[in-house]
Amino acid sequence: MKFNYHIIILLLLIVRLFTPSTAKASQNYINNLYPSDNDEFETLMEKIRKDFAQNPLIDEFLHKYDTAKGCFTDVDYSRRDRTNWEPLTHIDRLYDFAFAYTNPQNTYYQNEDIYNKIVKGLEYWYERNPNCNNWWYNQIAEPQKIGILLIQMRVGKKQIPAELETKTLQRIRKEGGDPAKWTGANRTDIALHWIYRSCLEKNEADLETALANAYSPIEYTVKEGFQHDNSYFQHGVQLYIGGYGDEILKGTTQVAMYTQGTKYALSTEKIQLLSKFMRQTYYQAIRGKYMLFDVLGRGISRKDITDKSATALFAERMAVLDPEHIEEYKAIIARLKDEQAADYKLKPLHTHYFRGDYTLHVRPGYTFDVRTVSTRTMRCEYGNGENLKTYFMSDGCTNIVTQGNEYTNIFPAWNWRRIPGTTAPQLDTIPMAASDWQTRGTSTFAGGVSDSIYGVSAYAYMDNYAGVNTGAKKAWFFFDNEVVCLGSGINSTSYAPVYTTINQCLLDDKNILLSQNKQQTTIKKGEFSYDSPDWVLHNGIGYIFPQGGRIFLCNQQQTGSWYDINHTESKEMQQREVFTLGFNHGTNPRNTTYAYIIAPGITSARQMNAYNKKNGIEILANTDAMQIVRNKKLNIWQMVFYREGTFTHKDICLLYT
C-alpha cells in the first residue's frame, strides 16, 4: 500500500523637513538650507535637518528659564538616575528652542532673546557637565541631541559662536564614546553623533569611521546583532527583535537615507539584509500596530511599549531604499497607521528561529508565537530596575492575537505567575534570575522545525532554581486554523500548586461562553473551576480541551502599578479587566499532562461545535517520551521524540533510537 504523508518530525534539538511652506519661508532660510555648492558634508546636514525638522511650542519652558544662569529652574542638575535622567531635559528644551529660532513659521523665528537663551544654555551645560550613572545618556542621548541642535543652528540668522561650538564638539569627541567598542544598536547609535560631529567639523576621516561603524552591524553574526536565522540579539545571546531591534532599524535606516545618492551610500547587500529582517521578522512580529510582548526584552515593563505605530517611519524609509518591495512596505505602513485592518495583506508564514529559541506563526486571521530558552540563549533580562517579574517569560510563553491589542498595557495588572503558555508553580514571590542582565538557560532540548508554512516546536526543562523545582515537556503543533498545545512529564516538588496558563489577556466586552457536556453557559465575573469542559470561547478565540483536565477561569478586575514591574515608572494603581484561563495541576504533580487547542476566528457556540466535529485533529501521543499530532485535513503528521521510543499507528511504525 502506498502512503503519501507529509511528516514533520522533531527528534533532538542541538542547536527603524518639516518642509516649511515655501510661500512663507524667507529666501534667506532657503538659501541657507539648500546651499548651491556640492559639498558632501552640507548635503548630509541638509538631510539631517530635514529628518528632524519641527515647529515646537516653547512658551511653557521659557517661564522656567533662568536668564542670568542659562539653566531651568525646575531641573535638578545633580541627578544621576540610570533611567529618566532629569538633566537631559535641559538639552531637550534647548533643542526645541533651536528649531523654534530657525523655523520661519514659528513665533520665535530669528528671535534675539531665544538665540541668547540657546547660547547661554549651551555655556551652562558645558561648564556644569552633568553626568549620568547610565552610560547610554552620556554617550548616546546627550551627544545625539546636541549634534542635531548644532546642525540646525547652522541655518540660523545668528549661529552658535565658533568657540562654544568647537569646545562642545571636542567634548563630545572625548566623552561621547567610541562606536568601535560597542556592538549592534549601541554601535550605530554612537556612530550617529560621530556623523553629526564630522559634518560640523568637515572631518572626512571621522565621517568615514562613523559610517563604517554605523554600517558594520548590518551583517550576520553569532554574537550580538543580526542572526543567521533572521532574528536579532542584544546583551549577549538574548532575543531582542523589538527594543534593541527598534533601535538598530531606526539608526541604520536613518543613516542610509542620509547617505543615499552620495559616495557613502549603503551597499545593496546590506539593504537586502535589512529588508529581509524587516519584512520577514520585525514587522511579522507586529499585529496591526502592536508588537508581540515577548520579543521586547525588558521594555515590556514600559507603558505603551507594544504600540509600534511610530515604526512606520522605518518602513517609509525602506520603501525608498528598497523599492523592489515597495508594495509590502505600503501594506505594513497601512496596518501600522490604522489605515487598514490588522490582517491586511498578511500571508501564511511559519518560522522557527533556531538561534533565538523562538517560533513565529502568522496567518491572516491570527498570530501566535512561542519563546523558550536553552543553554544556547539567555533568559529575558531585568536590568536598570525594569521588568522585575519576568522570570517565567522565557519558559514557553505564547502570544495569541487577532487584532494585536489583546495585551495592550495589561502588564502592571498581570499575574506574572500566569504568563500565557507557561507551566509554573504559583509561588508567593516570583524569583529573579541569577543575573539581571544575562542568565543562560538550562534546557538542552529547545527548538523546532518548519517548512515555512507549518511546523512544530518543543521545550523540555527542569528548573530547580530558587524553589521553582518544576519541569515539563511542552510542544506546539502549528496548522492553518489551529495550534495544538501539548504538555507531558509535568513534575514538581514545589510547595505551590502548578498551573499551565493558556491565556491571560484583556477581557473583551462580549460574553465568555463555556461548554460542558455539550451544555453552553455564559460566564459571569469571578473565579471558577471546571472539570473537563468541552471548550471556552472568548474574544473570537476558541479554546478546546480534547483530553479534559481541571480548568481554572478568571474573569475579573486585576490591579497593580507600573512601579511593581519597573522602578522608573509610576506607583499609581492601575485597574484592568482581565481574562485568564488555564490548567490547575495541583501540588506536587507527577508525570501530569495537558492538551489544548487554540482555534482563532470563532465567534459563536455554533461555530465552536462545528469546528469540534470537523477539525480533523488527532492527538496520537502525549507522553514523556513522545508527542504526536496528525492533521487529517492537511494530511500532516508532526512528531516530537524526547528519547528512544517506538510509535505505531495502523500501518505506520516509527522507531527512534
Show where each model-derived region lies.
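Alpha-helix boundary/N-cap detector
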Residues: 28, 32, 36-39, 43, ...
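Aromatic-lined, polymer-binding surfaces characteristic
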Residues: 62-302
